[in-house]
């Protein structure tokens, strides 16, 4: 076979030149940063000015490289922005981003199964994301920014960029009317070394957190404002076994955290609400904590409500909650200041049928601190049965006393005045009006509850 070595040699020299020319003819996509001169950009505008960072693709707009909206500039999402696909890029908002959608839900997608885009709001102002849909993201960080998410859906997020779908640092974003489903990490999180008080209102949290021991809402210390978690439904339906509902923790003693947990339904998780650490004051009102038993070992979880204090500055007021079907109803651990109802302000919590190992544990005061729990409904009017469902000083002298009398149903108990010797107490169980069990032979003048095999009544010993 004849070979022209001269031609072969010339092709070897020509090939690098051809590749260089092809490279020059192929558009290179680098990141783009807006000028910071007060300009408002739509995605249609970005196609014109970003030199290929934003283009028009098969389904709508495509973001091919990192994009930054500088301080002073605005990214506007309008009805003409139906869909945006993202490569594995970071979109940073240092200026502002707002949506004017009225009829169309703008959808942000990862470009394919391996591309997970990220967003970062840092020192951003007046951001309002409304009527949007985010899918296949790697996380959204909100850092010292003013951001509202309203009627936004978040699905299939990984944990590649942030721990939660929305990670919050040193700010108080509003997250309302939103839906979080099947994301790998918590829906909303904030760190232990920052302060954030998100306003989480009327949202649905559906089976978030995959293969990690974490709640769907996982918050560190609050800022000056109150953390408000109001009107949400938090649940798991796809057998995500070790997923808790809500946790608020101040493990480093940062600031003074205030929490309003109100009118939520928290069900079918590893636990309902966990409050842990140093200085936290919460009002827990009107919630339903249902069937939170997804824990193999009851020693590791399963409470409807758990208050774990490292000081008595860990405080909670509980009113009008329904707590049933959990491994433990309420657990109070170490140090705390818990008010479940007083004689002047009844708790009116409904607490019953919380059990594990064949034993009912509606309230476990695993602490030396006393606990007021007056005016609650325990699923029975039998004081002895209520007592058997509460673990406290009567069971272990090292524990604090739980005062549960009067309770809802005790009003119907007959009351009589007797002298010593007028009633046979040999087969009776006697409680003080604070719910403390006492020996019948040591009764002093006062009002008592006497429980016998045939019923219960109040007795007054003059």
Task: List the model feature ranges, each with a label.
Residues 1-32, 415:
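Bacterial Sec-dependent N-terminal signal peptides
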Residues 71, 444-445:
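Surface-exposed loops/turns
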Residues 410-436:
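Residue-level detector of functionally pivotal "anchor" positions at catalytic/ligand-binding pockets or at interdomain
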